[in-house]
Swiss-Prot record:
PANTHER family recorded: DNA TRANSLOCASE FTSK (PTHR22683:SF41), SPORULATION PROTEIN RELATED (PTHR22683)
Keywords associated with the record: ATP-binding, Cell cycle, Cell division, Cell membrane, Chromosome partition, DNA-binding, Membrane, Nucleotide-binding, Transmembrane, Transmembrane helix
The name this protein goes by in its record: DNA translocase FtsK
GO biological process, one term: chromosome segregation
MF-aspect GO terms: ATP binding; ATP hydrolysis activity; DNA binding
Family according to the record: Belongs to the FtsK/SpoIIIE/SftA family.
Biased composition (Basic residues): 1-20
Record organism: Lactiplantibacillus plantarum (strain ATCC BAA-793 / NCIMB 8826 / WCFS1) (Lactobacillus plantarum)
Protein localization: Cell membrane
Subunit structure as annotated in this protein's UniProt entry: Homohexamer. Forms a ring that surrounds DNA.
Domain notes: Consists of an N-terminal domain, which is sufficient for the localization to the septal ring and is required for cell division, followed by a linker domain, and a C-terminal domain, which forms the translocation motor involved in chromosome segregation. The C-terminal domain can be further subdivided into alpha, beta and gamma subdomains. The alpha and beta subdomains form the DNA pump, and the gamma subdomain is a regulatory subdomain.
Residue numbers spanned by region Disordered: 1-21, 231-298, 701-722, 762-795
Function: Essential cell division protein that coordinates cell division and chromosome segregation. The N-terminus is involved in assembly of the cell-division machinery. The C-terminus functions as a DNA motor that moves dsDNA in an ATP-dependent manner towards the dif recombination site, which is located within the replication terminus region. Required for activation of the Xer recombinase, allowing activation of chromosome unlinking by recombination.
Length: 795
């Protein structure tokens, strides 16, 4: 019972109050201090009575003219302290950054104050005296600048750095305070600033282009109007048989003969195009003064009657082309840093240490240039292409290892947002090359730089790519680029289009030697006519003892200046074949022979070829054609085999299509990736119609292919497909009364394919019979009566 009572006895509780803890006392103290500080700050801001003036002078002594900002910040801090009983819990970045920014602001306030007072020493004492004077007068009339805090900083910076240095120090401290406060990475800030400046620059550039476009159009119209009036006056006042006065009259006016060219150059874009105007002025000067013709630059392709024919010809303006708005690729900039990190991390996981040295954002791909660590094999990076594509979630990527001329490895990653390269933009950005009439812009490389191809340096170009890869657009870009840079007397075209739908739009322009050739048999004959023209030109070179077309044209100019005649100079000839595979299927031997001869000898004669095909197989692009066409342009293909057929290396199978190409001109070891320019069919028609409105087509009768010529080729004309050994082979077979391919190979020392074609041709013409397996062919042609005794005597 005693134990039970002990357990049920109630425990006594103390009724005394607990003493306040240390935290509660601290919070109460904070509340009181906050209340007092809040009251003092309010009195200072409102300047209530003498007490308020005293408190206001206290804040002015510290912060000077910025005392209201200082008091406002103090009010916020004291209000927080009064409510929560503790100081605001801010990180050290906010405290340090905020105080540093406010100090920089006070330092800037000191500069106008002391410049106004013209006082440059003892800044602290002067500020303190001004504060005492205001306090004694009971007012705030004096300019205190940045107060005692600002005066303390100014007394250090001014003797060392003067006012300019003080301003720079203050601005640097402000920027540093922002970085400290918000913990901003420097490279991200610079990248954001760069994007903002680029957008601003693009807007300013668009406005400037619009304004200059309007001015150029008005100036061009005025110049063309003046030129028309000058030409009308010259044609009515001067005799057509007098060459010198006809060119002298326009030269006396301000616009002169160069007005059409200068008008075109004024509209086409860049300030460098003004060089074309100078070149046009030189073209008029030899006619005005024949004695000065020997000093004319060799690039002038028009003299005598040709200059008079082209005097009114105006080059097409870039305003005829559609202006495509630029694509916003700001999202691509945002992914550059993350992709760079993914590349280094992925390669590091495979034991390959690299460092991203440079990144180039192009129209269709972004190129990351990596520097491998010492001991890293290049092949190891190349073998990880699929793993890198997986890490970047890319469709496909191309690795250039190493980059020519650099100790870096290039990784080209496709962009999610592809920027279209406008043909008008690259035409306006192309610098003027009066000495390079065959220079045409192709597009832009992965760094955004303009890529210009010079046909005279190539000298022949092979284009290959699958359907829809941009091959036909590239051909239109090159042809239109030549039409916009040259006159009909400078460049002539031979266009061959077996598909009949790609190049037909150019029919009727004065630059054509013949209408667009669409039949394969006529195309083979047309190529042989170009070969004949090449041989004719070499005969002219031999007679004049010149080595190439430029030297011959210069020689003709000198002769014209000496005797007053007007001998024509030779224009460039550009042969364009849009589908080589179709020609090789129908007339392979004739086409191949003509292409090989032109490839070997046509450069010095001023004849250049552009061959395009969508089937880059070895039976179309034969070894002889590849050997004689050194410059290549590969678009997207289906396999690495096709890529190796075009450019002798892989890479074209990884292209994106839509103008993405690998361009390898003669002399370049590795191909250059280029995003080709885009030109619409409407733009091509606009340029063609502009040219047709000025001149009509004047075809060369010697280059026209007639129907009877193709019929003669089918009947066995030796110049149109019959082998040169055919007649001798017929005599041999008739004499021996047996026919075999091996016999022709041994006797004429020719290859199997050629000998087999001769035997097949004899079979078609009824000379020999068909093949009967292992039995010899029957010979239908018998020896004549005169041949039989002769052969018997020989035996």
């Amino acid at each position: 019972m005693a134990r039970r009572q002990a357990t049920t006895k109630k425990r006594r509780t103390s009724t005394r109050k607990k003493k306040p803890t240390v935290a509660a006392k601290r919070q109460m103290t904070g509340n009181v201090i906050g209340l007092i500080g809040l009251l003092v700050t309010i009195l200072a801001l409102l300047k209530v009575g003498l007490v308020g003036m005293v408190f206001a002078e206290f804040f002015r002594a510290i912060a000077g003219n910025a005392y209201q900002i200082f008091a406002g910040l103090t009010l916020l801090v004291m209000g927080y302290l009064m409510i929560f009983g503790r100081w605001p819990r801010l990180t050290w970045r906010w405290w340090v950054g905020g105080n540093l920014f406010f100090f920089s602001y006070l330092l800037l306030l000191e500069i106008p104050m002391f410049n106004q007072l013209n006082h440059h020493t003892d800044f602290w004492s002067l500020t303190w005296n001004l504060i005492k004077n205001d306090f004694a007068k009971g007012g705030m009339a004096s300019n205190l600048g940045g107060g005692l805090v600002g005066a303390a900083g100014y007394s250090v910076t001014y003797p060392l750095l003067a006012n300019v240095g003080t301003i720079l120090i203050a601005l640097i401290l402000m920027v540093a305070s922002i970085y400290i406060t918000f913990d901003l990475p420097f490279h991200k800030t610079m990248q954001a600033l760069r994007q903002a400046l680029m957008q601003l620059g693009q807007q300013l550039r668009s406005g400037y282009e619009w304004l200059t476009h309007v001015l150029r159009v008005q100036i061009a119209r005025w110049r063309v109007h003046q030129q028309v009036r000058a030409n009308q006056a010259a044609s009515t006042e001067k005799q057509p048989t007098s060459t010198v006065p006809q060119s002298a009259a326009p030269a006396e006016t301000t616009s002169g003969t160069s007005a059409p060219d200068s008008a075109a150059s004024a509209v086409t874009s860049s300030p460098a195009d003004l060089n074309i105007t100078v070149a046009s002025d030189r073209e008029a000067s030899p006619i005005k003064s024949p004695t000065s013709a020997a000093t004319v630059d060799h690039e002038q392709e028009l003299q005598g009657t040709e200059v008079m024919d082209d005097a009114d010809y105006q080059l097409p303006e870039s305003t005829l082309l559609t202006k495509i708005p630029k694509t916003d690729q700001s999202a691509e900039y945002a992914t550059i840093e993350s992709n760079s990190q993914k590349l280094t991390t992925t390669l590091a996981s495979f034991g390959v240490q690299v460092e991203v040295k440079n990144v180039s954002l192009g129209p269709s791909v972004t190129k990351y240039e990596l520097h491998p660590a010492v001991g890293v094999k290049v092949s190891k990076v190349v073998n990880l292409a699929d793993d890198l594509a997986l890490a970047l979630a890319a469709k496909d990527l191309r690795i250039e290892a190493p980059i020519p001329g650099k100790s870096l490895i290039g990784i080209e990653v496709p962009n999610k947002q592809i920027s279209t390269v406008s043909f008008r933009d690259i035409v306006e950005a192309q610098p003027a090359h009066p000495t390079k009439p065959l220079a045409v812009p192709l597009g832009r490389d992965v760094s955004g730089n303009l890529v210009v191809a010079d046909l005279s340096k190539m000298p022949h170009l092979l284009i290959a790519g699958s359907t829809g890869s941009g091959k036909s657009v590239a051909i239109n870009v090159m042809i239109t680029g030549l039409l916009m840079n040259t006159k009909p007397s400078q460049v002539k075209f031979m266009l061959i289009d077996p598909k009949k739908v790609e190049l037909g739009v150019y029919n009727g322009i004065p630059h054509l030697l013949t209408p667009v050739v669409t039949e394969p048999k006529k195309a083979a004959r047309a190529l042989h006519k170009v070969v004949a023209e090449m041989e004719r030109r070499y005969e002219l070179f031999a007679d004049s003892k010149q080595r190439n077309m430029q030297g011959y044209n210069q020689y003709i100019r000198q002769q014209n200046a000496a005797d007053g005649q007007s001998r024509p100079v030779l224009p460039y000839i550009v042969v364009v074949v849009d589908e080589l595979a179709d020609l090789m299927m129908v007339t392979s031997s004739e086409v191949e022979d003509a292409i090989i001869r032109l490839g070997q000898m046509a450069r010095a004669a001023g004849i250049h070829m552009i061959l395009a095909t969508q089937r880059p197989s070895v039976d179309v692009i034969t070894g002889l054609i590849k050997a004689n066409v050194p410059s290549r342009m590969a678009f997207a293909v289906s396999s690495g085999t096709d890529s190796r057929t075009i450019i002798d290396s892989n890479g074209a199978e990884k292209l994106l299509g839509r103008g993405d190409m690998l361009y390898q001109p003669m002399g370049m070891n590795k191909p250059l990736r280029v995003q080709g320019a885009y030109i619409s069919d409407h733009d091509v028609e606009e340029v063609v119609n502009f040219i047709k409105a000025q001149q009509t087509a004047d075809y060369d009768d010697s280059m026209l292919v007639k129907d009877d010529e193709t019929d003669a080729a089918g009947s066995g004309d030796p110049r149109d497909g019959e082998d040169e050994y055919y007649a001798e082979a017929v005599e041999l077979v008739t004499d021996q009364q047996s026919a075999s391919v091996s016999m022709l190979q041994r006797r004429f020392r020719i290859g199997y394919n050629r000998a087999a074609r001769i035997v097949d041709e004899m079979e078609e013409r009824g000379v020999v019979g068909p093949s009967e397996g292992s039995k010899p062919r029957k010979v239908y042609r018998q020896k004549s009566a005169d041949e039989a005794p002769a052969s018997g005597n020989d035996a």
